[in-house]
Regions:
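A structural signal for short loop-to-beta-strand junctions that line the ligand-binding cleft
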Residues: 53-54, 60-63, 79-118, 137
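Early extracytoplasmic/lumenal segment of secretory-pathway proteins
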Residues: 1-75
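Ligand-binding cleft/hinge of the Venus flytrap
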Residues: 23-30, 118-174
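A bilobed periplasmic-binding-protein/Venus flytrap-type ligand-binding module shared by bacterial periplasmic
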Residues: 118-125, 218-232, 249-253
Length: 310
């Protein structure tokens, strides 16, 4: 029996269905002498995947599916993985275009899907003419997950660190993304940058969905596979996980931008451009540099490196 350890930190609002899918997959694989063990991270579990992998005693998995982007973007974490990864990017054909171009991270990470962040607003005309860096009073949320971090990194790369600081100073930043959505519903803010699944609840009379002028801000997820298992099995697992069934489910139920080309349905937020930090810029950003700014402006933010110190 071949044992495979998969770490999973993905789409929390669809997690019940994700778990049902993975339970069924694990059961099917048993007939082929494959024992799939899935360890879950994120909302509803004790820790995020990046927090666990940062620990000195962390056990490395065979496979990862993660929208916790610090796993891949924090060089102090990714260095534990990047010397033992297969070139998975070529294993599954993906839909080309600006949505994919924005999230490419090299040959060792296979883009799975992206959560598009768009405006949920009472002021659509202002949204149409306001750059992401120019907002005063914008709500957005997810302090200790990838949502706020990606917005901050996007602004930082395009407009500089001072622009990122100003955005945090002038915004209503909530613990989780739905908190920003609720801030607009409760009229604590006029506009929120939220997952499109929330913004689609706009009634078209008092509240509206508006794509940012720069395009949606993308929160991507990636699949990667370590050389701890044979390549043939790793490749099979990529195809089993990024299968038409799960991809179509994500597109239909989450309004997610799903990259495998066999996906039949597209997100309504696909656009001529998109915002996401680039791989070369992320490679230059140090842990200390990012978290110094981030934690200084957001007292609720946690820095795993500081948390590990005795």
């Amino acid at each position: 029996m071949r044992h495979i350890l998969l770490y999973w930190n993905h789409i929390c609002v669809l997690h019940r269905q994700e778990k049902t899918f993975l339970d069924a997959l694990a059961q099917r694989l048993l007939s082929d002498e494959i024992q799939l063990e899935v360890r879950y991270f994120g909302l509803g579990y004790p820790e995020h995947m990046s927090e666990y992998l940062a620990r000195p005693d962390a056990i490395l998995p065979d496979l990862i599916v993660s929208a916790d982007l610090e796993v891949f973007e924090d060089t102090d974490i990714f260095c534990k993985l990047n010397h033992s990864l297969y070139p998975v990017r070529s294993w599954i054909p993906l839909q080309s275009g600006p949505m994919l171009d924005a999230v490419e991270r090299g040959s060792f990470l296979l883009p799975f899907l992206s959560i598009p962040l768009v405006y949920y607003t009472r002021e659509p005309e202002i949204c149409r003419r306001t750059a992401l860096t120019d907002w005063n009073g914008l709500a957005f949320g997810g302090i200790n997950n990838s949502a706020v971090k990606t917005v901050v990194k996007t602004v930082w790369e395009r407009w500089g660190s001072q622009a990122a600081q100003r955005l945090l100073e002038r915004s209503l930043v909530t613990d989780i993304p739905i908190g920003a959505f609720q801030a607009v519903r409760q009229k604590q803010a006029a506009t929120a940058l939220v997952p499109s699944l929330y913004a689609l609840r706009a009634d078209g009379q008092e509240t509206f969905l508006q794509i940012p002028e720069e395009g949606p801000v993308l929160i991507p997820s990636y699949f990667c596979a370590r050389t701890s298992i044979p390549q043939s099995i790793a490749c099979r697992m990529a195809k089993e996980i990024l299968c038409p069934e799960l991809c179509s489910f994500y597109a239909a139920n989450g309004d997610l931008i799903v990259y495998p080309e066999h996906t039949s349905q597209k997100s309504r937020q696909e656009y001529s451009g998109a915002c996401c930090p680039s791989a070369p810029w992320l490679e230059r950003l140090t842990h200390e540099e990012f978290y110094h700014l981030y934690c200084q402006k957001l007292p609720k933010a946690s820095d795993w490196q500081a948390d590990l110190k005795p």
